[in-house]
Amino acid sequence: LEKALIALAAALAVGIPALATAYAQAKIGSAGAGTVAEKPETSGIMIILEAIPETMVILGFVVAIMLILQFA
């Protein structure tokens, strides 16, 4: 039972930030498409803004690995 709870915690540590990242990237992507259509010189900034929410998933993955390694 303990290993199942650790696996659940690790899955939630990655899954919840992944859902939040998907929502944020959808909003940023749609706004970015409109911005780049009007001002093409902002494409570099929009790529950076699109990548920023990915840090949530990366940090969630790190937390999941730490959970698995600490209790395994």
Which residue ranges define each predicted feature?
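Hydrophobic, small-residue-rich transmembrane alpha-helices and their short perimembrane loops
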Residues: 1-72
